[in-house]
Amino acid sequence: MANDKKHVIPREKYGRKRREYFHNEEREQRVQMERKARKQRAEKAEKLAKNNEERVKENLRKARIEKLTQEEIQQQQAMATKRNSSNSESEFEPSEDNALNHVSKQQPEEVSPTSDIAKDDVEVASTTNETNGYLKTNEISNDSDIDVNASTNKDRLHDDYFYSEEAQQSRVNQYIEEDNSDKVHNNIARNHKSGQTDDKSDQHRHSDQPTLIDKVKYFFKEHWAKVLIVLAVILLIVLINAIFNNVDHNGNTKDNIFQSSDNANKEKTYTDTMKSANSAIHSIVTVENDTSNNSSSAEKETQEAGKENELGSGVVYKKVGDSIFIMTNAHVVGDKKEQKITYGNNDTSIGKVIGTDKFSDIAVVKTKIKSGSDVKSIKMGDSSTLVLGEPIIVVGNPLGVDFKGSVSEGIVSGLNRHVPVDIDKDNQYDVLMSAFQMDAPVNPGNSGGGVIDKNGKLIGIASLKIDMDHVEGIAFAIPVNDAESIAKQLEAKGEVKYPNTGIKIANVKDMDEATHQSLNLPEEVNKGVVIGDVKDNSLGEKSGLQKNDVIVELDGKEVEDNLRYRQIIFSHKDDLDTLPAKIYRDGKEQDIKIKLK
């Protein structure tokens, strides 16, 4: 190749990239910083525009409210003036044509502001168009320049104009004019309707106000969360109330944590048994014929087991001033004339035995009590109306004052029972006691206690029970009708007089065969009493009874033995009637009358 020729490397053999010769790291950094600055300015401009827009809207809202208030006041004043003018014109009876003309004249005057507003809109629009044209021209000229500084000047120019007072004022005026145009049209229509009649204008004015439904909707829309909270609280209260009011009364929820003891006491239902027991305990006292204070009541009852009872209960059947009359068992009192009475809150006094009746096992004791004591007389019932299975309670002091006021429950197990009693403890029965049977538990110390019905009335005096192996729940009480009658006699006379026929008798069933044959009794006669001796001038002799007579029937009742004979005779102690009897004399049956007086 010649030396004078230029050495040229073919383009296809040129291996390096051309831009590597023109790479300027400082320029690249400057470009990135300018881009970042433009982005920040754009974000700032957007944020400022948003704030200005919100500020403009707030100003518009305030302007609207103020203008609405002024317009409303002006409207009401105008309507009041119109009503006054219409009332004055109605005296001259103006025609409908004049009224219509009057309305038509007013309408152009009211429409004129709309035309002015339209003109302003045109001016604003033209100004806006000119401004937009100016912006477009600048944008075209700026787009033609590829330099970075030119684009930056374009953004700055746009921001300066957008946030200029002229542009902001133009936008405010545009919003206000749009709002005014709508209100002017609404006022024209409202005034046109109000010019027809006063009633229609009133209805239109009321229609502008929010209705009750709108208020309710607005309230729920604004306060729906509070409403839900209130409803939830009410529902919770209702549920808790239902839990307390539906407690199981069968005892299954006794330990429920939601049930307090106070509520349980308030909700407790008193049964007839509970009422009777709480009333009767104030009429029950403890009777002891041992007035010493060396040992407890329980020890006395235990030590004297097998001996004459020294401790029992009593029922206050009468109260006169500070004195009380106590009905108890004769076997509790014994032969002593004084008894230790414990009543109320372990108060004691010494009572005097007014009288005892060993055949009926009834005794009466009188004593005085302290003032203010809660002891009261018990209500008397009627034992003749007892029904088998009737519920009863026994109130007494088993083992004395240590367990005073004890209550046991049961039913009437049997009526008209004849219970043999050994009075003198010689292992020979002396009398048949008329009693009713019950299954309520009766313990030592319950003797003389009260048997109470469901109404809290005294129907019997607990007297004895069958104490045998393999025998449970068989106790007996003296009917209150019999006990009260005996008590009144003891209170009045100190004793009870029984009729005495003056005859000595023995049981037919206890005779041997030879004696049975000597009396010439029929073989089928194996019950009754045979007369062994008749006292002179006795009721038996006056009645015509003789030795070896066999009495098999008395007062229409079969006579099984001497206990039954004595029971029938004693049952007529009050009336002393003459009783019909059937006897066998020399093997022949005869009827006879036995006198009791």
From Swiss-Prot:
Entry protein name: Serine protease HtrA-like
GO biological process: one example: proteolysis
Biased composition (Polar residues): 71-83, 125-143, 286-297
UniProt-listed Enzyme Commission number(s): 3.4.21.-
Organism the protein comes from: Staphylococcus saprophyticus subsp. saprophyticus (strain ATCC 15305 / DSM 20229 / NCIMB 8711 / NCTC 7292 / S-41)
Active-site residues per Swiss-Prot or TrEMBL entry: H331, D361, S447
Principal place of residence: membrane
Domain (PDZ): residue spans on this chain: 485-561
Pfam families: PDZ_2, Trypsin_2
InterPro entries: Chloro_Bact_Ser_Proteases, PDZ, PDZ_sf, Peptidase_S1_PA, Peptidase_S1_PA_chymotrypsin, Peptidase_S1C
Biased composition (Basic and acidic residues): 1-13, 21-70, 195-208, 298-308
Residues covered by region (Disordered): 1-148, 189-208, 286-308
Its membrane topology: Single-pass membrane protein
Top EC category: hydrolase
A GO CC term attached to the entry: plasma membrane
Location in or out of the cell: Cell membrane
Lineage start: Bacteria, Bacillati, Bacillota, Bacilli, Bacillales
Family listed: Belongs to the peptidase S1C family.
A GO molecular-function descriptor: serine-type endopeptidase activity
Stretches that traverse the bilayer: 224-244
Top-level taxon of the source organism: Bacteria
UniProt keywords, alphabetically: Cell membrane, Hydrolase, Membrane, Protease, Serine protease, Transmembrane, Transmembrane helix
Keyword Coiled coil: no
